[in-house]
């Protein structure tokens, strides 16, 4: 049995793409996933399965297409994936920065292209780490936040709708939920 985090993009944001978590948990349980749990309303779902990841991705894509067609991108990571990522995080990730976010790669995303685009940005008072699961992005000061490449350019990037973003607090909570 493998424990997974399913990070869904763009649900329950600003009253759009409404998903009732209790219903989603039941539907995913009916799909054959076990120990299905959610954390907050923004698309953090956890479950256990013996099904290989590749097959799970196919199953979830088909499920979302029928039941939640507005869910077109998601990230699926195992507890093992998460723990390996944490082992390789840079020292700055544990420091007290103004803001820290993880831009999770979604299934099927051209990661090399995303990295190339982000590497071309001129950073302002911010720091990056390219991980296996996503891009870890730290902003040093709240005062300079609006000058950062993160604030000025990220929304305009062609891949923006194909990543799902979580802050550092949620990233830590994902780790806790994966251990359950």
What residue ranges belong to the model's regions?
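Surface-exposed, charge/polar-rich loops and edge strands
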Residues: 2-42, 46-180
């Amino acid at each position: 049995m493998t424990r997974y985090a399913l990070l869904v993009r763009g649900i329950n944001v600003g009253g759009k793409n409404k998903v009732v978590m209790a219903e989603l948990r039941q539907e995913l349980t009916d799909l054959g996933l076990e120990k299905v749990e959610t954390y907050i309303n923004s698309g953090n779902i956890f479950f256990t399965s013996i099904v290989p990841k590749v097959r799970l991705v196919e199953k979830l894509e088909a499920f979302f297409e029928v039941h939640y067609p507005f869910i077109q991108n998601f990230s699926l990571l195992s507890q093992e994936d998460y723990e390996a990522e944490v082992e390789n995080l840079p020292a700055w990730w544990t420091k007290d920065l103004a803001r820290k976010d993880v831009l999770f790669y979604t299934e099927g995303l051209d990661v090399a292209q995303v990295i190339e685009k982000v590497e071309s940005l001129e950073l302002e008072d911010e720091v990056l780490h390219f991980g296996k699961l996503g891009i870890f992005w730290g902003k040093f000061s709240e005062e300079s936040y609006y000058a950062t490449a993160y604030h000025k350019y990220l929304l305009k990037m062609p891949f923006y709708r194909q990543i799902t973003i979580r802050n550092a607090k949620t990233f830590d909570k994902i780790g806790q939920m994966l251990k359950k």
